């Protein structure tokens, strides 16, 4: 059920600032993470659409929030928000600061935001920017906002390294969910899909 629902995802809109986003009354789940953490690959794998997270990333849109609608029979029942990867080395400092402010504003004030999915490459662990993001959202998490850390590219680690990375991240995530994920090995896909389904459909219970 969860994967079938995820496959309905389609591009909705893109916006450079929070106030350009449409006000929505369906649950919104935000995907965040540093550049090259595997965010686009994860979204495309979960939705079984090879180009979904790339389709709206035309030149000039790389610093936009991209929304994707989900729902069967054409009825939107949830939205994914793909936030730009942070930590671009090539982006001027003033642009980085501006974008961090936009992200922080979104994460703190977006009313229909129900969950955050943080992509993290377990070979590098949490970066300084990841930790800043966790601090920003902590008050909302304490109020009930769902939170998931996806350890992408898990196939790059041995089984022992995976177990260690999972244990460390569970401590750092402070009560959030943590899952190992590999698009290449199809690891963790069903697990993450089920969590997202449940968070978007709290009244329906388990998938």
Curated annotation (Swiss-Prot):
CDD domains: YihA_EngB
UniProt GO molecular function: GTP binding; metal ion binding
Gene Ontology cellular component list: cytosol
InterPro entries per the UniProt record, alphabetical: G_ENGB_dom (IPR030393), GTP-bd (IPR006073), GTP-bd_ribosome_bio_YsxC (IPR019987), P-loop_NTPase (IPR027417)
Cited NCBIfam families: GTPase_YsxC
Function (record text): Necessary for normal cell division and for the maintenance of normal septation.
Protein name: Probable GTP-binding protein EngB
Species of the source: Albidiferax ferrireducens (strain ATCC BAA-621 / DSM 15236 / T118)
